[in-house]
Amino acid sequence: MFNLKYFLVSSSLLFSVFSSPVFSNPKVLKVGAIPDQNQDVLDKRFNLFSKELSKQLDVEVKYIPVINYIAAVTGFRTKDLDLVWFGGLSGVQARLQTPNSIVIAQRDIDKEFKSVFVVNKNLELNSISNIKGLKKLKNLRFTFGSENSTSGRLMPEYFLNQAGVEIKHFKGKKAGFSGSHDATIALVNSGAFDAGALNKQVWENNLKNNPKRTSNLELFWITPEYVDYHWVAQGDLENRFGEGFTKELKSVILNLDIKQKSHKQILDMFNAKRFIKAESKQYKNIEEIGRKLNKIR
């Protein structure tokens, strides 16, 4: 259902962010990212990344936080953001709305990405080894992450459908949408929801670094592989930053070296060993699934 209040609040916040003086300066490279995790984590990661880009490209680079996935796509479409870290679905949505945009790179882990399904321990549900076991989630309180998340909604819903489970089969004939992977963990861990789906990397990071946050959770199932996150850039950056800028930008990202201390800090925060080349055609299957589930029209 359309929520007018939410739309107006989101729109006003979006306007206030993108009306900042930095947006009137054509010589500032504006970096954005989908808010898939806690904002403190994102701020640290992308401010560090932006600082390195600025150093190597010799231009001012500014990280601009956004309030939700839609704001990231909108900011890119309106050219208020120049370079954005998108998930598979949001990247496809952004590129379809922004002619001549360019896929710059993906992490080494993004060619073979996975989601996980987790359940609250109180359910005493055993983990499954076959997709058909997802039927055990019927009639439970289930939450996805953001409505436009690839690893927290699109692909989990796709796999659920493959097992014959639709949103109407959950308790109350609906699913929750936590907004981020961290929030999904918190909601299922607290018992507010019985089960949820999220990014496998975020799950593993929380297991390792925040054991209290996952103390009431059990891993239920790991999905098959699919392609996910990627950097997407505007196609006209050279008009503002000079000939060869896009190629140089791509080179800087691809050449981040885990053997260099400052680069390792960045790569560690992306849970990657390196960035690799990526092409838009790799995301064709994501687009097809997005259309099937009415996330792309």
UniProtKB/Swiss-Prot annotation:
Pfam families: Phosphonate-bd
Keyword Cytoplasm: no
GO CC, alphabetical: ATP-binding cassette (ABC) transporter complex; periplasmic space
InterPro entries: ABC_peri_PhnD-like, PhnD
Domain of life: Bacteria
Cell location: Periplasm
Coiled coil: none
Principal location class: periplasm
Keyword Nucleotidyltransferase set for record: no
Keyword annotations of the record: Periplasm, Signal
Signal peptide boundaries: 1-24
GO biological process assignments: transmembrane transport
Gene3D superfamilies: Periplasmic binding protein-like II
Family per similarity comment: Belongs to the phosphate/phosphite/phosphonate binding protein family.
Subunit structure: The complex may be composed of two ATP-binding proteins (PhnC1), two transmembrane proteins (PhnE1) and a solute-binding protein (PhnD1).
Free-text function comment from the UniProt entry: Probably part of the ABC transporter complex PhnD1C1E1. Binds strongly to inorganic phosphite and with very weak affinities to methylphosphonate (MPn) and phosphate.
Protein name, per record: Probable ABC transporter phosphite binding protein PhnD1
Organism: Prochlorococcus marinus (strain MIT 9301)
Chain's gene name: phnD1
